[in-house]
């Protein structure tokens, strides 16, 4: 059990085992706050900085899945599939710091009335509480973008400011895609990533 735990810490970059020397702790990695290679819910990241997170400009809609989204979520293609789109701006105190669009199949809600759900809560909490689905891992793609004009306005960006766009497919414990997320981050966040040479 201890050997497995050490192996996991080594995979995550916290430890390095060196033959003839022993096990070394990489203190720089231990002190990293927002690791892009570890999925952290953005409310937690904002609280860790000492700010209070909240969502506003919240929009929840039902939309028919495009062929691309149906493929990403591995939905049946023999009939139109309805998706739930949750769009929101997230604030840190009074500063707009990101805009997210979360997309879930309506079927995950098992005929539950959407009107009774507080969609201002973190999407992973909503998936766990109302869909009985735990997200365990994501596949993410990163892009530096200028972003759509409407989102730039909501985030109060200066003309020269870029956004970090994170596109994710989120998987359940059964390795099934259950959620697509597209998030535009401002430079409020300082992300780090631990990369190992292969």
Q: Which sequence ranges carry the predicted segments?
A:
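All-alpha effector-binding/dimerization core of bacterial HTH-type transcriptional repressors
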Residues: 27-198
